Swiss-Prot record:
Cellular component GO terms, alphabetical: cell outer membrane
Originating species: Escherichia coli (strain K12)
Disruption phenotype: Mutants show a stationary-phase competition defect during coculture with wild-type cells and an inability to utilize extracellular DNA as the sole source of carbon or energy. They have no defects in DNA uptake by electroporation or when made chemically competent.
GO biological process, one term: carbon utilization
NCBIfam families per record: IV_pilus_PilQ, PRK10560.1
Name of the protein: DNA utilization protein HofQ
Length: 412
């Protein structure tokens, strides 16, 4: 193909001020890329270094474009890369650059491999050495090693000085105390009137106003259960600034509530804490044709699992899992009887302030009470004593409520 070298025209647009960027008109047809780059470099009085792998031709027609834009257009069309240091312009291909980077990395790796190895021991104050070692192994050099001393919670390192310094800085950033949350809970059965006295009123709040003090968001619908005396839903509310312990004790003395349990737990950031209250019910399990039986157990417990997440500005996010498992019906089978367990489980996530109390409710029970009041002696007289006796029945509806108060524990 005929090359029109003479058609390579680089013409400066006369400028009024020297500060203005120079513009060029470039018209080339099937001209070697190296020659076009040489002409552009001479225009700016730059020294040009072209790598041996720069080849090929280019055809361009540019009119009155800035010199830098013209250079970028030529380089981009040829698939090249430029680098300017002072008045030296270097041009090479992408493949050459990748090979050069790989060669430099290989030389650095060889240099690292020849460095002398040193031993170092890092004692961790807060983090678990075993967990930290899993992530820290990636920072070791090819000849480096890391050993965990579980007894003293130390990392035993052997590597070159550069790698050890990087590891020490990384460990210092990771070995920080995690937030601790104290969880105070009260699991009670209470009637509706006493619940209102505590300032809790189950209401359906919209998303914008959910979680206000004394207001409760209904998070779930009723769950079906086997017994007719248990009704399950799920409500959640907040109580601020209350002496909850004293008020619950006072209501218990008035026989207006029963405190089932008052556990206190200490949980770390993102670590679950759980409490269970109940019993394990044994039942026999047949092993098939052999006829042998073994005893296994089913849990009939009230359980609560809380996983706290420590947030900014004294706020805590709680992931809650509450379960109420009670003995159900006795099922008849060919090899005997099996006790069913009625399960109600609720899982939710809420965000509260430190010291704010959550009220979790929605599991209802009914108690049918019957009693007799009579006048002493006279009430015991047959037939005639009915005039001096009073038979009464009371249908009491109580709700199982869990009050839980998370508080941030200072690490100082």
């Amino acid at each position: 193909m005929k090359q029109w070298i003479a058609a390579l025209l680089l013409m400066l647009i006369p400028g009024v001020q020297a500060a203005k960027p120079q513009k060029v008109t470039l018209m080339v047809d099937d001209v070697p890329v190296a020659q076009v780059l040489q002409a552009l470099a001479e225009q700016e009085k730059l020294n040009l270094v072209v790598s041996p792998d720069v080849s090929g031709t280019v055809s361009l027609h540019l009119t009155d474009v800035p010199w830098k834009q013209a250079l970028q257009t030529v380089v981009k069309s040829a698939g090249l890369i430029t680098r300017q240091e002072g008045n030296i312009l270097s041009v090479h291909s992408i493949a050459w650059q990748n090979n050069n980077i790989a060669r430099q990395e290989a030389e650095q790796a060889r240099a690292q491999a020849n460095l002398p190895l040193e031993n170092r021991s890092i004692t961790l104050q807060y983090a678990d050495a075993g967990e930290l070692a899993k992530a820290g192994e990636k920072l070791l050099s090819a000849k480096g090693s890391m050993t965990v001393d579980k007894r003293t919670n130390r990392l035993l390192l052997r590597d070159n000085k550069t790698a050890l310094s990087a590891l020490e800085q990384w460990v210092a950033q990771m070995d920080l105390p995690v937030g601790q949350v104290e969880l105070s809970a009260h699991i009670v059965t209470i009637n509706e009137k006493s619940l209102r006295e505590l300032g809790v009123k189950w209401t359906l709040a919209d998303a914008q106003h959910a979680g206000g003090v004394g207001q409760v968001t209904t998070l779930g619908s009723d769950l079906s259960v086997a017994t007719a005396t248990t009704h399950v839903g799920f409500n959640i509310g907040r109580i601020n600034g209350r002496l909850l312990d004293l008020e619950l004790s006072a209501l218990e003395q008035k026989q207006q509530l029963d405190i089932i349990a008052s556990p206190r737990l200490l949980a770390s950031h993102l670590q679950p804490a759980s409490i269970k209250q109940g019993s394990e019910i044994p039942y026999q399990v047949s092993s098939g044709e052999s006829g042998a039986t073994s005893v296994e157990f089913k849990e009939a417990v009230l359980g609560m699992e809380v996983t706290p997440t420590v947030l900014q500005k004294g706020r805590i996010r709680l992931k809650l899992h509450i379960s109420q498992n009670v003995p159900g019906q006795v099922l008849q089978q060919a090899d005997g009887e099996v006790l069913a367990i009625d399960k109600q489980e609720i899982e939710t996530q809420v965000e509260v302030k430190s010291g704010e109390t959550l009220a979790l409710g929605g599991i209802f029970t009914r108690k049918n009470k019957s009693g007799q009041d009579s006048v002493p002696l006279l009430g015991d007289i047959p037939w005639f004593g009915q005039l001096f006796r009073h038979d009464g029945k009371e249908d009491e509806r109580r709700e199982l409520v869990v009050f839980i108060t998370p508080r941030l524990v200072s690490s100082e």
